[in-house]
Amino acid sequence: MTTTLQQRESANVWEKFCSWVTSTDNRIYVGWFGVLMIPTLLTATICYIIAFVAAPPVDIDGIREPVAGSLMFGNNIISGAVVPSSNAIGLHFYPIWEAASLDEWLYNGGPYQLVIFHFLIGIFTYMGREWELSYRLGMRPWICVAYSAPVAAATAVFLIYPIGQGSFSDGMPLGISGTFNFMIVFQAEHNILMHPFHMLGVAGVFGGSLFSAMHGSLVTSSLVRETTETESQNYGYKFGQEEETYNIVAAHGYFGRLIFQYASFNNSRSLHFFLGAWPVVGIWFTALGVSTMAFNLNGFNFNQSIIDSSGRVINTWADIINRANLGMEVMHERNAHNFPLDLAAVEAPSIKG
């Protein structure tokens, strides 16, 4: 009898927990994905803050020349970063228990792996949680599809690119100037500016900003008057009201006359689908481009494409970019190798004495 009661009580506790996790009445929805999301994002955040403030220098290139990234070792908010794990570690999984000591783990950049792995699991489960809440509320599932674009971009720079390059030391540093350094080195080694997928991403981000500004300004300029001149226009809208708060016909007529008729949407649903899809597709392409460049399928190379009748090169913009790439490649990791990899790969000319 006692055993039966205990089983029933434990079952009740589990059922209460399940109903609480999946309840849409909570102020913040937890969900089954949230059960994994919350601890992983908390772990990543706490470790990131501690490492950004106090982590000792990391031997990022694996040549016994540690690079300081934390505030306590002389950096500021702009220059500080969680430095990627050492090239000596490569792609090895490097949790704390794999190191001989905590000092060794810190020296080899262990916190970087801890942060990015927990962060990636956290954003994957956040995306799953978006789907889960949409499902519970009977909504369509496109919110998590839109969120998949930044998730794909983060996965590309933190996971796919290091795998393709053979070391987590090539991952993006977790800091402001570290991000810029990553971008410059990426351009030097992969010519990303000449990759069509990156061009699509630029069109997605800049175009999305333009369309967002256009839509916001058109709506704001065609609001239905509900207030006096002395009141804020925002008081003219009541949350949940059934009536349209702006005149889409007026906005359509304005923009159709400003450009031409068919450049203006006359359907609010197709308009908002377009506003969501444009930047998402662009960022998907950029993530795809970074993931292919990870395995050295690089941007277009039009260097020295034009020559005159005497065989002399007529420089184009591609040649200017190439010279800049070589200069950037020479300067980064300057103690790890003496020449850019492009130059080092060429056989030395034979000298006949």
Swiss-Prot record:
- Which residue ranges run through the membrane? 29-46, 118-133, 142-156, 197-218, 274-288
- Entry function: Photosystem II (PSII) is a light-driven water:plastoquinone oxidoreductase that uses light energy to abstract electrons from H(2)O, generating O(2) and a proton gradient subsequently used for ATP formation. It consists of a core antenna complex that captures photons, and an electron transfer chain that converts photonic excitation into a charge separation. The D1/D2 (PsbA/PsbD) reaction center heterodimer binds P680, the primary electron donor of PSII as well as several subsequent electron acceptors.
Q: What is its EC number?
A: 1.10.3.9
According to UniProt, the reaction catalysed is: 2 a plastoquinone + 4 hnu + 2 H2O = 2 a plastoquinol + O2
Query: The organism's lineage?
Result: Bacteria, Bacillati, Cyanobacteriota, Cyanophyceae, Oscillatoriophycideae
Q: Which residues bind pheophytin a?
A: 126
Q: Report the co-factor binding details.
A: The D1/D2 heterodimer binds P680, chlorophylls that are the primary electron donor of PSII, and subsequent electron acceptors. It shares a non-heme iron and each subunit binds pheophytin, quinone, additional chlorophylls, carotenoids and lipids. D1 provides most of the ligands for the Mn4-Ca-O5 cluster of the oxygen-evolving complex (OEC). There is also a Cl(-1) ion associated with D1 and D2, which is required for oxygen evolution. The PSII complex binds additional chlorophylls, carotenoids and specific lipids.
Which protein, by its recorded name, is this?
Photosystem II protein D1 1
Annotated organism of origin: Trichodesmium erythraeum (strain IMS101)
